[in-house]
Amino acid sequence: MNPYIVLLKPRVIWLLILSSVVGYVYAAGTVDWGRLAALTAAATLAVGGSAAFNHYWERDIDAAMARTARRPLPAGAIPPSNALVYSLALSATGILLGFYLLGPLPGVFVALGWFFYAVVYTVWLKRRTWLNILGGGFAGNATFLGGYALGKGTVDLPAVLISFAIYLWIPSHIWALAYKYREDYRRAGVPMLPAIIDEGKAVAIISALNIASAAYILWLYLVFGRGLPGLALVLAGVAGTVATSALALREKSDRAMWRMYKASSPILTLFLLALVFS
């Protein structure tokens, strides 16, 4: 894959872009394909720009971790100065498009999505505190709320409640991955939760958060969703998440934690698709 595409973290940002799209479709009722295309472009550029900036800012951390040592900057595929200019150009273009094409309120949320990931998470919190992902997770709220604001012209309580499905899922997902690579994080000096507390406590916290996230998603669909096809999708995600989380709590093994990570990964996507079916 082209290293400049890798800088965008496509395997990470696609879910945030999907949340923007779903927010719009869920709120709008009738889809304006031109506005949806503009939203997708602005979200992709802004979120992709923040991901590229994360690559630039964390290039020393990436070089110290076996999992990330082959990324474009530590591998020498792209000069850091190029990555910085690239990230800022994408970010600025995405944010400006958000305000110009989408309007003030959606534009604010596009900018906030960038800010929480690039500044709050990457610059302020990542190296300082295990609370890093709890601060940066608001980027997930912002992406959904931006799409919702575009579709409805405002942000209401249902929108905020639904956006917290993304916020709750992010730390449980990231911490489950960090548990597998906890030695990498310790070596790099990054205070991710599984790297700084007892492993048994980490398993308990991550598993409990996964179960809580699944329960919250199910409640959201029962309140705001409609239709059996969507309910079937949500129940499939909830069942896989709860079952593997309970197994991880009981076994407290690396294998069980990885199984939980893999099984719980699709639940947010399934929930977002269920909202579209509603």
Curated annotation (Swiss-Prot):
EC supergroup of this enzyme: transferase
Protein origin, superkingdom: Archaea
GO CC entries: plasma membrane
Kinase is among the record's keywords: no
Residue intervals passing through the bilayer: 12-32, 36-56, 72-92, 105-124, 130-150, 157-177, 204-224, 228-248, 257-277
Catalysed transformations (reactions): heme b + (2E,6E)-farnesyl diphosphate + H2O = Fe(II)-heme o + diphosphate
Pathway as given in its UniProt record: Porphyrin-containing compound metabolism; heme O biosynthesis; heme O from protoheme: step 1/1
Record membrane topology: Multi-pass membrane protein
Keywords noted in UniProt: Cell membrane, Heme biosynthesis, Membrane, Transferase, Transmembrane, Transmembrane helix
GO biological process, one term: heme O biosynthetic process
Enzyme Commission numbers on file: 2.5.1.141
Annotated localization: Cell membrane
Pfam family for this entry, one: UbiA
PROSITE patterns on file: UBIA
Molecular function as annotated in GO: protoheme IX farnesyltransferase activity
Stored InterPro entries: Protohaem_IX_farnesylTrfase (IPR006369), UbiA_prenyltransferase (IPR000537), UbiA_prenylTrfase_CS (IPR030470), UbiA_sf (IPR044878)
Family as reported in the entry's similarity comment: Belongs to the UbiA prenyltransferase family. Protoheme IX farnesyltransferase subfamily.
Known role: Converts heme B (protoheme IX) to heme O by substitution of the vinyl group on carbon 2 of heme B porphyrin ring with a hydroxyethyl farnesyl side group.
Additional note from the record: Carbon 2 of the heme B porphyrin ring is defined according to the Fischer nomenclature.
Name used for this protein in its record: Protoheme IX farnesyltransferase
Source organism per UniProt: Pyrobaculum neutrophilum (strain DSM 2338 / JCM 9278 / NBRC 100436 / V24Sta) (Thermoproteus neutrophilus)
